[in-house]
């Protein structure tokens, strides 16, 4: 059986996105040079990985202040709305992972973070002392960690790249975040593979390990598998309920019949038994059919 890492679709990107060697002093000099030349940020910069340099350029274009100390916080009403969605399938799929990691990270000077597709933190677990330190820079529920809000960081850069990524210490764009190391990986919707969240391992720079990005990717993949199982069970129960009400008409009738789950995805189209070779039918199964704002 393949491991989560073997199955992860971006498994070939680990070495590209994880630093082989890291010299914080050299990276700090590269950052200072970059900030001093903000009007010409595309100039080549030595001493920093390309993936980080490109993120600095994006952060600069977004108007992020280099001296920013903390991430902005989402307004309570907006956070409450996001939490309502999180209480459904996403929460069920992540709880085992978060519970297990909470115990593992106790005393390990690290924390695990779950965000939504916009980089808004929904839940944090881990070492209490680290959680308290994180709250000082809004590395806490409600903090907004997209690149456009907080510059180069594990969560925001993983969101932008749609790949697992490591951002260590001086590689962060904002001064207030340079004491931290973050390894993050995107969580994908099992139906359409869009990003629905980020799982992120964070701590002060002493937790730096090259394999942390791969570890985050494995956690993300485990959550995706749990989401897929939950979605399959939900779709099966819906199909079972519909067939149970009028089994003969559902399976053998000539009328058009489509079954759409509560996320607006087509899970059954009776026309497929007559025109199974039609790509428009097979391609539609499991894909968004209605324009719903929710996603799984």
Language model feature labels by segment:
Residues 1-148, 156-166, 179, 188, ...:
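Intrinsically disordered, low-complexity terminal regulatory regions
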Residues 130, 134, 268, 272-285:
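PAS/PAS-like sensory domain cap-loop motif
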Residues 237-244, 275, 290, 296:
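Hydrophobic transmembrane signal anchors and adjacent membrane-proximal interface regions, especially
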Residues 155-156, 277-296:
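Terminal output helix/cap of sensory domains in signal transduction proteins
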Residues 171, 180-185, 287-296:
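PAS-family sensory/regulatory modules and their coupling/dimerization elements
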């Amino acid at each position: 059986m393949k491991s989560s890492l073997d199955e992860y679709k971006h498994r070939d990107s680990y070495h590209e996105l994880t630093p082989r060697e890291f010299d914080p002093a050299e990276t700090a000099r590269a950052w200072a040079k970059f900030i001093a030349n903000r009007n010409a940020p595309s100039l080549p910069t030595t001493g920093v990985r390309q993936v980080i340099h490109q993120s600095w350029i994006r952060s600069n274009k977004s108007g992020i202040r280099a001296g920013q100390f903390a991430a902005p916080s989402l307004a309570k009403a907006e956070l409450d709305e996001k939490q309502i969605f999180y209480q459904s399938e996403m929460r069920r799929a992540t709880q085992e992972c978060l519970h297990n990691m909470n115990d593992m990270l106790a005393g390990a000077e690290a924390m695990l973070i779950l965000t939504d597709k916009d980089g808004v933190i929904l839940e944090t677990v881990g070492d209490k002392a680290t959680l308290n330190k994180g709250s000082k820079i809004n590395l806490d529920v409600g903090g907004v960690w997209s690149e456009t809000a907080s510059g180069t960081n594990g969560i925001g850069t993983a969101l932008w790249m749609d790949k697992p990524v490591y951002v260590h210490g001086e590689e962060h764009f904002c001064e207030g975040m340079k004491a931290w190391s973050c390894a993050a990986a995107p969580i994908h919707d099992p139906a359409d593979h869009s990003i629905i969240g980020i799982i992120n391992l964070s701590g002060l720079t002493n937790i730096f390990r090259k394999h942390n990005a791969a570890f985050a990717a494995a956690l993300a993949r485990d959550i995706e598998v749990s989401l897929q199982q939950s979605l399959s069970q939900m779709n099966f129960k819906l199909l079972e309920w519909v067939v149970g009400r009028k089994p003969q008409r559902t399976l053998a009738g000539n009328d058009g019949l489509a079954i759409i789950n509560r996320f607006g995805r087509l899970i059954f189209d009776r026309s497929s038994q007559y025109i199974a070779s039609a790509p428009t039918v097979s391609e539609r199964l499991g894909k968004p059919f209605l324009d719903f704002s929710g996603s799984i």
